[in-house]
Amino acid sequence: MNFFTMCVFGAAIGMAIGTLGTAIGQGMAVKSAVEGVARNPGAASKIMTTMMIGLAMIESLAIYALVVCLIILFANPYKDIALKMVETVAK
């Protein structure tokens, strides 16, 4: 495997792990909010507002994972070093 193939696999695995954690967290948050509304329907607006803020914070982790994976794919700081190594090996 060359450097760029490893970058693609690394970005894919990183995104999978990052979204898996956020998906589990969001599922647990929604489950708890639905249980809270079922127990106290009068507090539904407060519960939903708090849940939406919490979901936005949880989703930010997935966005950070996406940004890191995009940096790995398109703005990799080690790309030039890898290309120089390939050139020296090819000579």
Curated annotation (Swiss-Prot):
Q: Which molecular-function annotations from GO does this UniProt entry contain?
A: lipid binding; proton-transporting ATP synthase activity, rotational mechanism
Q: Principal place where this protein is found?
A: membrane
- Entries under SUPFAM superfamilies matching the protein: F1F0 ATP synthase subunit C (SSF81333)
Q: Write down the membrane topology.
A: Multi-pass membrane protein
Q: Where in or outside the cell?
A: Cell inner membrane
Q: Which InterPro entries match?
A: ATP_synth_csu_bac/chlpt, ATP_synth_F0_csu, ATP_synth_F0_csu_DDCD_BS, ATPase_proteolipid_c-like_dom, F/V-ATP_Csub_sf
**What PROSITE patterns does the record point to?**
ATPASE_C
Quote the cellular component terms of the Gene Ontology held in the record.
plasma membrane; proton-transporting ATP synthase complex; proton-transporting two-sector ATPase complex, proton-transporting domain
Which Pfam families does its entry note? ATP-synt_C
Q: Which domain of life is it from?
A: Bacteria
Hey, where's the site called Reversibly protonated during proton transport on this chain?
A: E59
Chain ranges passing through the membrane? 4-24, 53-73
**Keywords linked to the UniProt accession:** ATP synthesis, Cell inner membrane, Cell membrane, CF(0), Hydrogen ion transport, Ion transport, Lipid-binding, Membrane, Transmembrane, Transmembrane helix, Transport
Q: Supply the HAMAP family for this chain.
A: ATP_synth_c_bact (MF_01396)
**What does the UniProt record say this protein does?**
F(1)F(0) ATP synthase produces ATP from ADP in the presence of a proton or sodium gradient. F-type ATPases consist of two structural domains, F(1) containing the extramembraneous catalytic core and F(0) containing the membrane proton channel, linked together by a central stalk and a peripheral stalk. During catalysis, ATP synthesis in the catalytic domain of F(1) is coupled via a rotary mechanism of the central stalk subunits to proton translocation.
Q: Which family does it belong to?
A: Belongs to the ATPase C chain family.
Quaternary structure per UniProt?
Answer: F-type ATPases have 2 components, F(1) - the catalytic core - and F(0) - the membrane proton channel. F(1) has five subunits: alpha(3), beta(3), gamma(1), delta(1), epsilon(1). F(0) has three main subunits: a(1), b(2) and c(10-14). The alpha and beta chains form an alternating ring which encloses part of the gamma chain. F(1) is attached to F(0) by a central stalk formed by the gamma and epsilon chains, while a peripheral stalk is formed by the delta and b chains.
Q: What is this protein called?
A: ATP synthase subunit c 1
